[in-house]
Design a protein with these regions (language model features):
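Flexible, charged surface loops at secondary-structure boundaries
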Residues: 1, 86-88, 247-248
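Acidic two-metal-ion nuclease catalytic site recognized across multiple nuclease folds
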Residues: 189-249
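A generic secondary-structure signal
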Residues: 14, 81-85
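Short acidic, Gly/Ser-rich segments with clustered Asp/Glu that frequently serve as metal-coordination loops
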Residues: 11-18
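Metal-dependent phosphoesterase signature
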Residues: 60-81
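Metal-dependent phosphoesterase core characteristic of DEDDh/y 3'-5' exonuclease domains
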Residues: 20-25, 29-63, 85-197, 202-203
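N-terminal accessory regions of nucleic-acid-interacting proteins
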Residues: 1-4, 209
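Short hydrophobic beta-strand that contains or immediately precedes a catalytic carboxylate
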Residues: 7-9
Length: 249
């Protein structure tokens, strides 16, 4: 089976994947040339009566508990859809900060509904890719051909809505999951068109075995590393050096 991307985004009732819940899910499958396959998904998920969204979530998304009850799928039904229709074999799940945020909500969703919480990101040719780190490394190392935004404080910013605005990409209704997915695909195309070698290299580096060859305590060499822990002054990127393994190996 040919590999495909599935770009997705969530709107949630809060920031804690253990306690909070998914309210909106949107996604679009594409081929490896980023051309759409089929229709996009844009669905609400019913919040249980014991889930109280944070005020910030309500203000940012505009999604109320009442709306999820009226229009949403039951969480168990949604989990089945993800498992059987969306995160199918040979799917590369793609998001923006998904490894640290969205993927954790999906894992906890599967766990609550008696699905394996990890297989959807590795089994049968599946994998995942976080475009936030791709954006960080492209900005730091291969910025040519792309307009990189500055926020209202005069500091570099990699917020999706600012990148789209700086590059003339339509992105109305930021923080609506489907609008964010459409914008993310457009930004991915922008990077692929302007920095194809960087794009191809970083796509390959979603494979942890290739990363392990770079970050190898038995053959120590410096490597370039991007992370939100680093300062904006250095484009969230640094040169790191492996010293020892963590207790997790």
């Amino acid at each position: 089976m040919a590999q495909t991307f599935f770009f997705y985004d969530l709107e949630t009732s809060g920031l804690n994947p253990r306690q909070d819940r998914i309210m909106q899910f949107a996604g679009q499958r594409t081929d490896m040339d980023l051309q759409p396959i089929g229709e996009p998904y844009n669905i609400l998920v019913t919040l249980n009566d014991d889930t109280l969204p944070s005020p910030d979530a309500l203000m940012v998304t505009g999604i109320t508990p009442q709306k999820t009850v009226e229009e949403g799928y039951a969480e168990a039904q949604f989990a089945r859809m993800l498992s059987e229709e969306i995160f199918t074999p040979d799917t590369i799940a793609v998001g923006f900060n998904n490894i640290r945020f969205d993927d954790e909500f999906i894992r906890h969703l599967f766990w609550r509904n008696f699905y394996d919480p990890y297989e959807w990101t590795w089994k049968d040719g599946r994998s995942r890719w976080d475009l936030l780190d791709v954006v960080r490394l492209t900005r730091a190392l291969r910025p040519e051909g792309i307009e990189w935004p500055i926020d209202d404080k005069g500091e570099p910013s990699n917020r999706l809505e600012l990148i789209t605005k700086a590059n003339g990409i339509e992105h109305e209704n930021a923080h609506d999951a489907l609008a964010d997915v459409t914008a993310l695909i457009a930004v991915t195309k922008l990077i692929k068109q302007n920095q194809p070698q960087m794009y191809d290299y970083l796509l390959k580096m979603r494979d942890k075995k290739l990363v392990q060859k770079l970050v190898n305590v038995d053959d120590k060499k410096p490597f370039v590393y991007a992370s939100g822990r680093y300062d904006k002054e250095f484009a969230k990127t640094t040169v790191a050096f492996p010293l020892t393994t963590s207790r997790n190996g």
